[in-house]
Each structure stands twice: as C-alpha cells, then as structure tokens.
C-alpha cells in the first residue's frame, strides 16, 4: 500500500475499523467520542469531504496521518503510515 493509497482512505473508515462510530452525523460532518482519550460528550469532529479531523477537547487536528500519530503515539511519518496500513489491512 503506497502513501497516496493511504492518503485516500477515509478517516471515518479507520475510526470504524478501530471500533469508533459517529455519535452524530450532519452532511459532511461527523462527531465522535474521542478515540484518543476518555470523554462522555463527543468533541471529536471529522469533516468527511475535506478528510480532516479536530479534537476540540485537546485542540489537536489534521489529516489521517496526524490521527494515526495521535492514536499510536508516534511522530514518525512512516510509523504512522504503517499503523494505518495495518488497521486497514494493507501492507
């Protein structure tokens, strides 16, 4: 699986494969309980059209790679790419 293929994976697909489903949807907007920390009120936002996320509880956000870094606690781009490929089932 190359970087462009990984970049094309929808964030919501990775979240689903990790066991996280949206609490609320409205058009291109999805709200989740944060996959990175415990919370009771959904503050984790995904814009499905733009392919970006923002956690209003922490102020962090970005693309699928930064999300992989948050979840896997990795700053390295290749480690993030491997994490995504592993979750998605690619090699």
Language-model features, listed with the residues they occupy:
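N-terminal structured subdomain of primase-like DNA metabolism proteins
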Residues: 1-91
């Amino acid at each position: 699986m190359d970087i462009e293929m990984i970049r094309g994976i929808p964030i919501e697909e990775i979240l689903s494969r990790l066991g996280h489903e949206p609490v609320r949807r409205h058009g291109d907007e999805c709200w989740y309980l944060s996959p990175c920390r415990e919370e009771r009120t959904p503050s984790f936002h995904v814009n499905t059209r733009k392919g970006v996320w923002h956690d209003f509880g922490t102020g962090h956000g970005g693309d699928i790679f930064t999300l992989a870094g948050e979840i896997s606690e990795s700053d390295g781009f290749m480690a993030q790419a491997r994490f995504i490929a592993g979750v998605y089932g690619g090699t």
